[in-house]
């Protein structure tokens, strides 16, 4: 809705004419006379008065309003036409029938402005004239003709008429709008055209106390309410006022008391027409050349005048409408009282069959009351208002209907959702179809019991239910799809972990080729439609997510199994395998330093040869392992993992680098420290073994202890023990265990010596130290006694 307000005034009824070149003026032509005869010479008049071929370049403007309100004066001042105007000394009807005139120029703030388009103006006989009295037939038909053939309909109204019903011609407009809807409504539905008519409300004699915006709001509200109350055909009930009309406003001051302001308001209205061109829109035009419009106007008048389907309401029908409306209102109020009594509370678990029967009884009671009072009036009106009552009752019952239907749907949807979760992805798509079909059938059956045999539509309920089902299924599909992805990633992670652990047993140049081959074996098998009924896009997204997570798992598992600590332990184990044990897996005994140094170098080399293999994932062809996705990209991690650590963005990552150079140096330093300690320990044991007792000492012992040896030989007990000891030594020598046995014996002896020294130190300790300890013990005992006494 548009507004335009001048600084304006109080009733303009006298003729006022802006001087214009009289040679440009053309006499108006009466296209419909007061006896309802149509003038077929319109086209000749237009061709004669127009300066050039009109074609489609024209606009039709008409004026509508009460008699003697200055309609003709407004047109003459604005469009520089020469319609007859009322003699101010004698208020009586001036315009009879409908007149048409060509506008040579339009009055604007720039002066007389020539329009780019040809403007044809129709002056329509005023309404509510004393000459016609109660005969409103012509004024209704004339108003309908103007509305049907014009692009812009000027409704000329005094400020004091705004808010009135009869004074503002609302009753007449209602009748005209009803017939207009019947005439053009079906055409609009069939052709889907966007044709409209602009209602230009010119508020005359505007004092300025009430703002134009307020007047416009009141008048627009009256139009909307009037449209809502129209008796529309069933197929046209959904059409709105805005589908047929646009509304804009313009206010004019009093022509006599404020002539200057009145003229300025006229000029501003002219600006809106031809300067800014805001009032002429393509959808207002009938989109036919001028000769087609004249033919259309003639056919339109014939249909309005003669077609019985468009007969305007008679007084009898008007009375019937009024009385039937009263009866409908009374019956509906009685229905509402019963409605409130029965449906004060909503039953959580109703019997739908009983509820449907109650609906039918309430409605039938209302129909019987209506029929008893309204059936004596005009049958068409009676039936029409009965339909209105039916619609009112159905609309009210629909409230309870919707509540129970919604509760039923919610209950069944909860069960449906639990059933979906219980499927755990097994035959998901098939079971979803079965469950959803059963759910819709259950709702359809239960709700139809209270639908008044289909009068209360199930379409919205079923549509909403279907959307809810789709939403629940879509949600569960995502859950199941994520579950499949996560389970597959776990399976891949377990397989990858086993593969890496196996390769760590004996790493070599083909280690990462084997790991990658095992990874790709599981990685590339993932795919398909998953049997969830998901779209190809969702399936592809799931595959992408699986692959991204798989590479993340590759990275995480390798770093978990090959950490600094585990790498150090692995190097030590490989070193010990060569340094402490021989090829047969038996403990190795070193008898000289040369053998120790040689074995130490071999063991150390054996351990360190896997360090470059395990710290950087490189294939046999020299290339590093590169993932299909940049798993360190924050956007990808957000997309596939749902979040990421901002601190990771500050670090430079290399997928193939398992141990950094700094960590590698730390591991190498710790490894060297550990193996060097083992080397020194082993070397010390060799030195101890070599420096024990010289061999010649054994010869001296043999010479000096000959008698003792002989005594042992001659003694059966000692001789037997010697035989057993000798046999044991021989067996150990034969089995190759003599050296290990000697080492064990030597270490046992060393431990015995250490323990003996400790005991001897305790025995030989100074007496004063012993005495001191005893005194300390006594003092402690005394304190304990005192504390106990306390």
Swiss-Prot record:
InterPro entries: G_GB1_RHD3_dom (IPR030386), P-loop_NTPase (IPR027417), RHD3/Sey1 (IPR008803), Sey1/RHD3-like_3HB (IPR046758). Gene3D superfamilies: P-loop containing nucleotide triphosphate hydrolases. Keywords: Endoplasmic reticulum, GTP-binding, Hydrolase, Membrane, Nucleotide-binding, Transmembrane, Transmembrane helix. One of its GO terms (biological process) is endoplasmic reticulum membrane fusion. The keyword rRNA-binding does not apply. It is a multi-pass membrane protein. The chain crosses the membrane at residues 693-713, 717-737. GTP binds at residues 65-72. Residues 1-692, 738-790 are cytoplasmic. Its EC number is 3.6.5.-. Belongs to the TRAFAC class dynamin-like GTPase superfamily. GB1/RHD3 GTPase family. RHD3 subfamily. Cooperates with the reticulon proteins and tubule-shaping DP1 family proteins to generate and maintain the structure of the tubular endoplasmic reticulum network. Has GTPase activity, which is required for its function in ER organization. This is Protein SEY1. It comes from Candida albicans (strain WO-1).
């Amino acid at each position: 809705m548009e507004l335009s307000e001048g600084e304006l005034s109080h009733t303009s009824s006298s003729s006022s004419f802006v001087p214009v070149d009289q040679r440009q003026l053309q006499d108006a032509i009466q296209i419909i006379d007061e006896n309802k005869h149509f003038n077929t010479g319109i086209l000749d008049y237009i061709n004669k008065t127009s300066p050039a071929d009109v074609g489609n370049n024209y606009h039709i403007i008409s004026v509508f309003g009460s008699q003697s309100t200055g309609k003709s004066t407004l047109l003459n001042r604005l469009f520089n036409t020469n319609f007859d105007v009322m003699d101010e000394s004698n208020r009586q009807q001036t315009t009879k029938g409908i007149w048409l005139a060509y506008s040579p120029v339009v009055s604007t703030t720039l002066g007389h402005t020539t329009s780019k388009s040809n403007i044809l103006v129709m002056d329509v006989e005023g309404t509510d004239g004393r000459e016609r009295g109660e005969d409103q037939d012509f004024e209704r038909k004339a108003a309908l003709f103007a509305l049907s053939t014009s692009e812009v309909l000027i409704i000329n109204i005094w400020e004091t008429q705004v808010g009135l019903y009869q004074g503002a011609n609302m009753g007449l407009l209602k009748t005209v709008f009803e017939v207009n809807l019947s005439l053009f409504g079906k055409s609009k539905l069939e052709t889907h055209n966007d044709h409209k008519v602009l209602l230009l409300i010119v508020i005359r004699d505007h004092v300025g106390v009430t703002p134009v915006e307020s007047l416009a709001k009141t008048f627009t509200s009256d139009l909307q309410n009037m449209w809502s109350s129209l008796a529309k055909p069933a197929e046209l009930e959904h059409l709105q006022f805005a589908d047929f009309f646009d509304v804009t406003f313009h206010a004019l001051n009093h022509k006599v008391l404020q002539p200057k302001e009145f003229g300025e308001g006229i000029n501003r209205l002219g600006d809106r027409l031809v300067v800014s061109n805001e009032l002429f829109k393509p959808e207002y035009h009938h989109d036919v050349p001028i000769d087609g419009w004249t033919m259309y106007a003639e056919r339109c008048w014939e249909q309005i005048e003669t077609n019985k389907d468009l007969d305007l309401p008679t007084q009898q029908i008007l009375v019937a409408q009024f009385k039937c409306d009263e009866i409908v209102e009374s019956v509906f109020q009685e229905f509402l009282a019963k409605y409130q009594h029965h449906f004060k509370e909503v039953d959580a678990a109703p019997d739908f069959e009983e509820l449907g029967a109650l609906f039918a009884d309430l409605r039938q009671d209302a129909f019987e009351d209506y029929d008893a009072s309204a059936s004596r009036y005009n049958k068409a009106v009676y039936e029409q208002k009965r339909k209105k009552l039916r619609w009112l009752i159905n609309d009210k019952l629909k409230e309870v209907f919707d509540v129970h239907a919604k509760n039923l749907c919610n209950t069944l949807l909860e069960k449906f959702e639990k059933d979906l979760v219980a499927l755990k992805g097994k035959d998901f798509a098939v079971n979803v179809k079965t469950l959803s079909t059963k759910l819709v059938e259950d709702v359809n059956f239960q709700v139809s019991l209270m639908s008044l045999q289909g009068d209360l539509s199930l379409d919205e309920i079923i549509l909403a239910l279907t959307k809810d089902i789709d939403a629940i299924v879509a949600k569960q599909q995502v859950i199941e799809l994520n579950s499949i992805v996560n389970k597959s990633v776990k399976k891949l992670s377990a397989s990858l972990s086993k593969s890496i652990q196996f390769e760590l047993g004996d790493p070599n140049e083909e280690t990462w080729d084997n790991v990658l081959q095992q990874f790709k074996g599981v990685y590339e098998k993932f795919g398909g439609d998953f049997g969830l009924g998901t779209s190809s896009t969702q399936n592809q997204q799931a595959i992408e997510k699986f692959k991204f997570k798989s590479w993340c798992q590759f990275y995480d598992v390798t770093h978990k199994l090959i950490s600094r600590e585990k790498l150090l332990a692995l190097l030590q184990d490989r070193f010990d395998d060569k340094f402490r044990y021989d090829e047969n897996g038996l403990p190795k005994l070193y008898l000289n330093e040369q053998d120790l140094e040689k074995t130490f170098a071999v063991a150390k080399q054996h351990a360190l040869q896997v360090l470059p293999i395990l710290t950087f994932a490189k294939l046999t062809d020299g290339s590093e392992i590169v993932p299909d996705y940049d798993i360190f990209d924050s956007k990808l991690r957000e997309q596939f993992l749902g979040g990421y650590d901002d601190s990771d963005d500050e670090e430079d990552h290399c997928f193939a680098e398992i141990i950094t150079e700094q960590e590698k140096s730390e591991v190498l330093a710790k490894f060297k420290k550990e193996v060097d300690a083992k080397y020194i320990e082993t070397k010390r044991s060799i030195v101890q073994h070599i420096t024990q007792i010289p061999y010649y000492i054994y010869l001296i012992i043999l010479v000096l202890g000959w008698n003792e040896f002989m005594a042992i030989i001659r003694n059966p007990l000692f001789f037997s023990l010697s035989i057993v000891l000798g046999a044991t030594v021989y067996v150990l020598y034969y089995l190759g265990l003599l050296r290990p046995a000697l080492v064990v014996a030597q270490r046992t002896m060393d431990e015995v010596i250490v323990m003996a020294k400790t005991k001897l130190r305790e025995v030989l300790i100074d007496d004063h130290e012993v005495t001191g300890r005893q005194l300390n013990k006594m003092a402690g005992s005394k304190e304990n006694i005192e504390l106990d006494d306390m």
